């Protein structure tokens, strides 16, 4: 969408130089359908995750704190999906006013940063728990986890402020529709470039480097443990999980990040070709579906790595209430690896060496 603006009677009016870009009948049908599916699956799944972690597992571990906050961040975003579904179904006609435009846009931005930051902290926590289980005990406390989550929510809120400030409702004269969109003046390129780079670097590059580094070090520690304990059969599932986590994150977000940056270049007038604008505007909602659907599945994905979580989850589905007594913390395959470099380990110690347990 290439926009030129003017002000008449105090109303912001926009001319769209590529009025047909991204406006395809299949988009107006497919995307609202996908949004609806994401909404139903996401609300159901993340609500159950919150109930299981808070009421059944009693929120006793660092990992459970991060997963709970991840699910809550997803729920905040999911509540705005019906607005975006209606918006797309109405062929990008925004009927909800300027305030909801800002709130819904900020929610999308907030979820991006909060979820990515939480996944990054979760990867660091897994690294500390697995590679340095004894040294990290004093640092991996519930207080530290809760304070970290508060900081993450504040950072995500600050990163979402541009959506509150600069996302507005505009009337496009040559298509006669009202849109909820960012609009940048072509002569002021600093702001959009800064926001675009912030989204790319802070919302993807830095977190991905940290996640990749954390799980690579975990991978090396596990391989070293298997070499030391030669008589213990290798559990390749753990390595598949590590690979899946890294690839899952990368391929979920790369398409959206690429097209988001291209959209900024189009807004600035760096890209003038309407055919390119059409490709970008068509691809953007599809990449959003990929990124945020996978994002909303993350709490379930990480949770189901644990036996206790699966047991409590199935217990909840069967309407079995949580027991009054407290339970041990979240048990996952992605948690604490403890091993001794000794060939005289007991069988129980050998078993725990490769079983990831959140402490």
From Swiss-Prot:
Biological processes annotated in GO: blood vessel development; drinking behavior; inflammatory response; kidney development; maintenance of blood vessel diameter homeostasis by renin-angiotensin; neuron apoptotic process; regulation of blood pressure; regulation of systemic arterial blood pressure by circulatory renin-angiotensin
Extracellular side: 1-25, 90-98, 166-190, 269-278
UniProt keyword list: Cell membrane, Disulfide bond, G-protein coupled receptor, Glycoprotein, Lipoprotein, Membrane, Palmitate, Phosphoprotein, Receptor, Transducer, Transmembrane, Transmembrane helix
GO CC terms in record: plasma membrane
Cysteine-cysteine disulfides: 18-274, 101-180
PTM description: C-terminal Ser or Thr residues may be phosphorylated.
Membrane topology of the entry: Multi-pass membrane protein
InterPro entries in the record: ATII_AT1_rcpt (IPR000190), ATII_rcpt (IPR000248), CCR1-9-like (IPR050119), GPCR_Rhodpsn (IPR000276), GPCR_Rhodpsn_7TM (IPR017452)
Subcellular location: Cell membrane
Lipidation feature positions (S-palmitoyl cysteine): 355
Cytoplasmic-side segments: 56-61, 126-141, 217-239, 305-359
Glycosylation sites noted in the Swiss-Prot or TrEMBL record: 4, 176, 188
GO molecular function, one term: angiotensin type I receptor activity
This protein's record includes keyword Cell membrane: yes
Self-association and partners: Interacts with MAS1. Interacts with ARRB1. Interacts with FLNA (via filamin repeat 21); increases PKA-mediated phosphorylation of FLNA.
Family: Belongs to the G-protein coupled receptor 1 family.
Role this protein plays: Receptor for angiotensin II, a vasoconstricting peptide, which acts as a key regulator of blood pressure and sodium retention by the kidney. The activated receptor in turn couples to G-alpha proteins G(q) (GNAQ, GNA11, GNA14 or GNA15) and thus activates phospholipase C and increases the cytosolic Ca(2+) concentrations, which in turn triggers cellular responses such as stimulation of protein kinase C.
Protein name per its UniProtKB record: Type-1 angiotensin II receptor B
Organism whose genome encodes this protein: Mus musculus
């Amino acid at each position: 969408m290439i926009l030129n603006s003017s002000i008449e009677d105090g109303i912001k009016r926009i001319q769209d130089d590529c009025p047909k870009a991204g406006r395809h009948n299949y988009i107006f049908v497919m995307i609202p359908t996908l949004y609806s599916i994401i909404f139903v699956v996401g609300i159901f799944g993340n609500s159950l995750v919150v109930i299981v972690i808070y009421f059944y597992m009693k929120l006793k571990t660092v990992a459970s704190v991060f997963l709970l906050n991840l699910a809550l961040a997803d729920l905040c975003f999911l509540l705005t999906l019906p607005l975006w579904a209606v918006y797309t179904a109405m062929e990008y006609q925004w009927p909800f006013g300027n305030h909801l435009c800002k709130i819904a846009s900020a929610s999308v931005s907030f979820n991006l940063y909060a979820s990515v930051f939480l996944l990054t902290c979760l990867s660091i926590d897994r690294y500390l728990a697995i590679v340095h289980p004894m040294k990290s005990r004093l640092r991996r406390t519930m207080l530290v986890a809760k304070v970290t989550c508060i900081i993450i929510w504040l950072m995500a809120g600050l990163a979402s402020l541009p959506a509150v400030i600069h996302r507005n409702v505009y009337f496009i004269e040559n298509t006669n529709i009202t849109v909820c969109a960012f609009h940048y003046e072509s002569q002021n390129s600093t702001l959009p470039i800064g926001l675009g780079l912030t989204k790319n670097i802070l919302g993807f590059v830095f977190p991905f480097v940290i996640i990749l580094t954390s799980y690579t070090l975990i991978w090396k520690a596990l391989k070293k443990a298997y070499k030391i304990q030669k008589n213990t059969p290798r559990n390749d599932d753990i390595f598949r999980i590590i690979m899946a986590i890294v690839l899952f994150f990368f391929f979920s977000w790369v398409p959206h990040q690429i097209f988001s940056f291209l959209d900024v270049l189009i807004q600035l007038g760096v890209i003038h070709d309407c055919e390119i604008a059409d490709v970008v505007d068509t691809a953007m909602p599809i990449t959003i579906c990929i990124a945020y659907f996978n994002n909303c599945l993350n709490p379930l994905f990480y949770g189901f790595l644990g036996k206790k979580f699966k047991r409590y989850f199935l217990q909840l589905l069967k309407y079995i209430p949580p027991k009054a007594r407290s339970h041990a913390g979240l048990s996952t395959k992605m948690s604490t690896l403890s091993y001794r470099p000794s060939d005289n380990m007991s069988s129980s110690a050998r078993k725990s060496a490769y079983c990831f347990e959140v402490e």
